[in-house]
Each structure stands twice: as structure tokens, then as C-alpha cells.
Design a protein with these regions (language model features):
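Non-transmembrane, aqueous-exposed alpha-helical and coiled segments at domain scale
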Residues: 1-217
């Protein structure tokens, strides 16, 4: 996010933090790294207006270590954040998975996000739900000609607007409109397939000079 001329990398908090009048929520569909979240809360001064669902799964050190084993890095092209292993524990319904309510440092920020958002909607106020990544890296997979995005070109979960509703705890009938955000130049983090990737040094130089250079957070 670029705000007031500054580049603000965010991985946990919603990009709506740039609006000082907004209340920020992280729904239970998000797996949370407490260290990164607390750092961003302090860095972007959102303490007092950000709340986290009590049942957000927690990324622990063991998840990050597992995510960085050679197979996951080279075959599945993971970014190594621990998101995948934490999501997998939730799907497998293991008893070892921790939730936000189990982390002492997160207790000041806990709430039932779905309940809060539905109350806000019933009062006629506006809610903007922010998803991550792009539709075509949903782990449901897509076919493009003879190529399939699954398994190397997908992320750990579905990334469509429908799943976003479930992630934040609201029903799809509450949604008035869905906004799709496009970038003029596509980018990708990781080593998976990337059709039409620009590798020509001269073209890349022009992109950088035009201010369109992008780096993963």
C-alpha cells in the first residue's frame, strides 16, 4: 500500500488502515501470525481500532519451519510464511492447532467478527471486505488450454468473493456489489508457473523507471 508517499507493506492488517475513520477487522478465515500482526498494529498505529476474531487459527514457528522444507519450497513453490501448514491443521481438525483466543498478547484485540459485522450491516452501515491474492490462484484450480493451475500455481485456499463472505462471517445475500481489482502488470511471488512472464532486461528496466516495480511483502 502506498500512503502519503510512503510504501507500507502489509501482510496481516487490512489495507483500509489508511482511512483513520475506519474500524478494522480480521475474520476467522484468516490464519494469523501474532508477531507480524502486533508489529503492524504498532507500525501503522491502529491500536484501538483493529479487532481479531477469537477463532482465527495461529501460525506458529513449527508451521513456518514445515513450510520451508525443500519439497514445499521447490515443488509447491510456497512463500514460506507457515500459512499452508496452519491451514492444513485446520482441515485435518487436529487438536494441536491454536487459535487467537489462546494467545495472551492478542487478548486486547479479540471479538466475534461475524457478529460485529452483521450488527453493523443491520444498522445500515457500510462494510468493505478485502480478499487476498487473485481469483485464478484459488486452490480449486483453473484450466487454461492444456495447462492447469493446480497444484503448483495455486495458494492454500479458495480466493473467490464467495469464500470471502464465509471468512468474515456474513451471508452472500448481504453483499451489494463485488469489485474486481486489476493490475496493469501482473506479478507473482514464488516459483510456480507464470504465463507471459517478462524476462527481457530492457523491458524490466522500463517498468522500474515507470514506478511499476513490485516486490512481495
Amino acid at each position: 500500500v502506498v500512503y502519503n508517499g510512503k510504501i507500507c507493506p502489509v501482510r496481516m492488517i487490512p489495507s483500509g488502515f489508511v482511512n483513520p475513520n475506519s474500524q478494522l477487522y480480521i475474520g476467522r478465515g484468516v490464519v494469523v501470525d501474532p508477531d507480524i500482526l502486533l508489529d503492524e498494529i504498532k507500525r501503522y498505529e491502529v491500536d484501538g481500532r483493529l479487532l481479531v476474531d477469537r477463532l482465527c487459527p495461529i501460525i506458529e514457528r513449527r508451521h513456518i519451519d514445515e513450510d520451508n522444507v525443500p519439497y514445499n519450497k521447490t515443488v509447491l513453490n510456497t512463500t514460506g510464511t507457515g500459512t499452508g501448514p496452519a491451514q492444513l491443521e485446520r482441515v485435518k481438525r487436529t487438536a494441536d492447532l491454536k487459535f487467537a483466543k489462546d494467545v495472551d498478547s492478542l487478548r486486547p484485540y479479540l471479538t466475534d467478527v461475524g457478529e460485529r459485522l452483521n450488527d453493523v450491516i443491520e444498522r445500515g452501515e457500510k462494510v468493505l471486505g478485502e480478499g487476498t491474492q487473485g481469483t485464478f490462484i484459488s486452490n480449486y484450480g483453473f484450466e487454461f488450454g492444456d495447462d492447469m493451475t493446480y497444484p503448483k500455481g495455486v495458494t492454500t485456499k479458495d480466493t473467490t468473493a464467495g469464500t470471502l463472505c464465509a471468512d468474515i462471517g456474513i451471508g452472500p445475500t448481504a453483499v451489494e456489489s463485488v469489485v474486481v481489482v486489476f493490475k496493469s502488470i501482473a506479478s507473482k511471488v514464488g516459483n510456480g508457473p507464470f504465463p507471459k512472464e517478462i524476462t527481457d532486461p530492457e523491458r524490466l528496466r522500463h517498468i522500474e523507471e515507470d514506478g511499476q516495480q513490485e516486490y512481495g511483502t
